[in-house]
Amino acid sequence: MDTGNIKDIKELLDSEAARINSPEFIADDPVQFPRRFERQQDIEIIALLSATIAWGNRKMICRNCEKLIRIFEGRPYDYVMDGAYETLPDGNIHRTFFVENLKHYLRGLRSIYSRFSTLEEMAVAEGVPADEMPAWRLVEAMNRRFAEANGGMCDSRCLPGNLRTTALKRINMALRWLVRDDGIVDMGVWKALRPSQLFIPMDVHVGNTSRNLGLLQRRSNDREAVIQLTDTLRAFRPDDPVIYDYALFGLGIGIGVANS
């Protein structure tokens, strides 16, 4: 992109980010669910699980996030630590995510919370804030602890295992909620990470929108594409590159490549 075009693109992204990053965005987005809670552990649990099932139709995602909160009886951390999930009957949570997958996830979280006061504390102990790729380092640590809590078994429905290639869209989205703190949509309860360290939550819609805008050349929506796109956005806002996740969402709707 030439200098003039870069300036135009930045102005477009800034304008769209300001429009979408507003209180009105919350009501139709999965971020509404962790925002209902005040205790950090509750926020972490609901942020992770809401992000985990955040694929497909947004109305269905939100409906099934409500289902999770009902299962937890409105007290996620207490529910996890009581081990109440072990008696859940088989059933579907969201699309290809079933109760057996939920149990795997909650066993892992229970193991973590039995050793650390918060998931953030575990992240610090695992060196996540010092890593150049914090989301991938976090998932590596969580996968290891989840496997320990599940007889050595991993579950790709819960967390990806192919960390060399995965875009980690859902964990990067959860980290956006947990780390960014502008007092509007994202909650900023994690202080060990800075917004400048975050990476864009990449999916097919973000990828297509970014290519249409000339922000991304790579054709695959993988880890390398996340790095390339985030580096481009970081040149616009070194302190907060993922603010442009809102812009790419809004512009994606406008050009017909994002979920409604």
Specify the residue positions occupied by each region the protein language model found.
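HhH-family (HhH-GPD) DNA N-glycosylase catalytic core used in base-excision repair
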Residues: M1-S260
